[in-house]
Swiss-Prot record:
Disruption phenotype: RNAi-mediated knockdown is largely embryonic lethal. Fertilized eggs show a metaphase-to-anaphase transition defective (Mat) phenotype. Arrest occurs at meiosis I at the one-cell stage of embryogenesis.
Organism: Caenorhabditis elegans
Tissue specificity as recorded in UniProt: Expressed in germ cells.
Record-given protein name: Anaphase-promoting complex subunit emb-1
Keyword rRNA processing found: no
Keyword Plastid among UniProt keywords: no
Amino acid sequence: MALMYPFHVAQPPLNWSEHLWVSEVSPAKESFITTICEHRQAQWDNQDLLRHLQDSVAILTREDQRHVNAVHAAANMPANP
């Protein structure tokens, strides 16, 4: 029964005949809650997309990126005649 109620419902009713005790949700609050849910879903989707990659491929820290850029720049420098 707990799965039937969204997370912003304050307390589920004790009897089926009782009404839900919910504060009125303004359009701004509804938009905020929707944005949070969409952001969480996007994070889960991104994690699923990167799950098959190794950590060394999927995660590059700033230090790794600086090292890659330095090596790439050194390889492209012309040799002195």
